[in-house]
From Swiss-Prot:
Highest rank taxon of the organism: Bacteria
Gene giving rise to this polypeptide: rpoY
Function of the molecule: A non-essential component of RNA polymerase (RNAP).
Keywords: DNA-directed RNA polymerase, Nucleotidyltransferase, Transcription, Transferase
Protein name: DNA-directed RNA polymerase subunit epsilon
Gene3D superfamilies xrefs: RNAP, epsilon subunit-like (3.10.20.730)
Quaternary context: RNAP is composed of a core of 2 alpha, a beta and a beta' subunit. The core is associated with a delta subunit, and at least one of epsilon or omega. When a sigma factor is associated with the core the holoenzyme is formed, which can initiate transcription.
Any GO molecular function: DNA binding
Signal peptide (residue range): none
Catalytic class of the enzyme: transferase
Annotated Gene Ontology cellular component terms: DNA-directed RNA polymerase complex
Membership in a protein family: Belongs to the RNA polymerase subunit epsilon family.
Source organism of this protein record: Streptococcus pneumoniae serotype 2 (strain D39 / NCTC 7466)
Protein's UniProt keywords contain Transferase: yes
Length: 77
């Protein structure tokens, strides 16, 4: 399953929509909840300075759209 993680690069400032970044993770999980938990743990372990805002499971249609926009790249830690 592919998850899209919305985050701020620092926890020092209040979140602003204009500075929200995204990354994509390929998580092997048996449920959506397990995948979200695993995604959060991966990001927090590897990028503790990131302020995670939201984690979204991508549907097939949304994944295709993300690939078409050119912004899609799986992050590996």
């Amino acid at each position: 399953m592919i998850y899209k993680v919305f985050y701020q690069e620092t926890k020092e400032r209040s979140p602003r929509r204009e500075t929200t970044r995204t990354l994509y993770l390929d998580i092997d999980a048996s449920s959506e909840l397990e995948g979200r938990i695993t995604a959060r743990q991966l990001v927090e372990e590897n990028r503790p300075e990131y302020n995670i805002e939201y984690i979204e499971l991508l549907s097939d249609k949304l994944l295709d759209y993300e690939k078409e926009t050119g912004a899609f790249e799986i992050t590996e830690f």
